From Swiss-Prot:
It comes from the Eukaryota. The lineage of its organism: Eukaryota, Metazoa, Chordata, Craniata, Vertebrata. SMART domains: RAB (SM00175), RAS (SM00173), RHO (SM00174). Keywords: Angiogenesis, Cell membrane, GTP-binding, Lipoprotein, Membrane, Methylation, Nucleotide-binding, Palmitate, Prenylation. A lipid is attached at C3, C11 (S-palmitoyl cysteine). It comes from Mus musculus (Mouse). Signal peptide: none annotated. Belongs to the small GTPase superfamily. Rho family. The gene is Rhoj. GO terms for biological process: actin cytoskeleton organization; angiogenesis; positive regulation of cell migration involved in sprouting angiogenesis; regulation of cell shape; regulation of endothelial cell migration; regulation of sprouting angiogenesis; retina vasculature morphogenesis in camera-type eye; Rho protein signal transduction. Residues 212-214 form a propeptide. Its main location: membrane. Palmitoylated; regulates localization to the plasma membrane and may be mediated by GLUL. It is a lipid-anchor. This is Rho-related GTP-binding protein RhoJ. A motif (Effector region) lies at residues 50-58.
């Protein structure tokens, strides 16, 4: 397990929360960039070497409302071979990040077909945030050529907002683990969701910046 200190967000907490160990679990199809997402955030650098299917549990010290908390980041494998083992990492989760790649339409559809049903079955009361990954590939020529060959296109921000509303996600955010664009906002939102989950009456759409960064 790796651990490093990070001052992430001031979420308007009332100051009476006891120091907590926070648990954030990332789920989604294989090859959508979950591991790189976590490693890039935890290490503040994109992994240049081979990335295993599941990386080690990382812990990051975050400051919320003037109090320090330990944020545990948990990777999961999206392949079907892990369907029986994956839920073993779910107990005591405070927030889930459901990931899909904006250049992998199948991973987008599987959010509603596979991942939300699994979470509702295993952890029905835990909030989740929808994350679009690999946004740096939206303009990548090789990626665009591959999608064109399959008669597909990259998914837009509007696609993510629509899906977030449909599944009752707390919020939709996009990021790139490679460039780190939007990366910190993803985990700021995860922390905010733990302390101040929103009711799912209409969902929370486009919540960029709803956490004050310090």
């Amino acid at each position: 397990m790796s651990c490093r200190e990070r001052t992430d967000s001031s979420c308007g907490c009332n100051g009476h929360e006891e120091n907590r160990i926070l648990k954030c679990v990332v789920v989604g199809d294989g090859a959508v960039g979950k591991t790189c997402l976590l490693m890039s955030y935890a290490n503040d650098a994109f992994p240049e070497e081979y990335v295993p299917t599941v990386f080690d549990h990382y812990a990051v010290t975050v400051t919320v409302g003037g109090k320090q908390h330990l944020l545990g980041l948990y990777d999961t494998a999206g392949q079907e071979d892990y369907n029986q083992l994956r839920p073993l990492s779910y107990p005591n989760t405070d927030v889930f990040l459901i990931c899909f790649s904006v250049v992998n339409p199948a991973s987008y559809h599987n959010v509603q077909e596979e991942w939300v049903p699994e979470l509702k079955d295993c952890m029905p009361h835990v909030p989740y945030v929808l994350i679009g990954t690999q946004i740096d590939l939206r303009d990548d020529p090789k990626t665009l050529a591959r999608l064109l060959y399959m008669k597909e296109k990259p998914l837009t921000y509007e696609h993510g907002v629509k899906l977030a509303k449909a599944i009752g996600a707390q919020c939709y955010l996009e990021c790139s683990a490679l460039t780190q664009k939007g990366l910190k906002a993803v985990f700021d939102e995860a922390i905010l969701t733990i302390f101040h989950p929103k009711k799912k009456k209409k969902g929370c759409l486009g919540c960029h910046g709803c956490c004050a960064i310090i």
